[in-house]
Amino acid sequence: VLFHGYQGSAETMLMIGYLFNHDFGFNVLIPDLRGHGQSEPSAISMGWTERTEVVDWIRTADSLFGGNTQIVLYGVSMGAATTMIAAAEESLPACVRCAVEDCGYTSTRDIFADSWEKQCRLPLFPLFHLSDLWCRILYGWSFAKASPLDAVHRCRLPMLFIHGDKDSVVPVEMVHRLYEAKIGDKELWILSGVDHGAAYLHDPQIYAQRVRTFVEHWFECPAILEQ
């Protein structure tokens, strides 16, 4: 089950979908997250509310593909953040064997603060804090709540972390924090000279080999979540 990034859609994931389907032999489900693509207009929560929808999509995939499936979660950017948060949910179905996150961020607060300082060149206080308060009042979630960093502290699912060391959107230091915080089985792959979301295009063959090796290893361990 594959998840796109902010302002993306299922269509923007077709190359990765082709990789998993044609090259790896997987059935693939690529949904439009809330407020994106053909989904109904809705407030985007950078992974927090979306996490429950991920669980629903997993159950849908399990049903569509026979009810006795093994599932890998894959996400890019906001989709990666959503994947990490969902992977720590207690309601995550046991059919999920592993997850791959590509260029996800530590928390909505961190990525918004970093972008704010880069683009606005204004102090965080008070406008940033007022924006956070507005989200709390209007939508019921805060920037700090949507936190993959907190989620991976609780996540037992094997996870592959992918990031470019020249990422201009999500600083590479964030993936190091995520990797260090992740409990259980994990792998970290830093690509030299690669910008945000460009890891696959940088070298499709190496990318495919690395992802496939990780995923197939955990598909050989069907009882990983029961350990």
Q: Where do the language-model regions lie?
A:
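Short alpha-helix in the alpha/beta-hydrolase fold that links the catalytic acid
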Residues: 16, 148, 157, 171-180
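Short beta-strand/loop motif that positions the catalytic acidic residue
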Residues: 154-156, 161-163, 167
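Catalytic active-site module of serine/aspartate enzymes centered on a nucleophile-bearing elbow/loop
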Residues: 201-227
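Catalytic histidine neighborhood in serine/cysteine hydrolases
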Residues: 179-198, 204
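The serine-hydrolase catalytic nucleophile loop
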Residues: 6-20
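Alpha/beta-hydrolase active-site loop
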Residues: 44-65
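Conserved alpha/beta-hydrolase
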Residues: 17-40
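Hydrolase active-site cap/lid region
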Residues: 85-144, 150
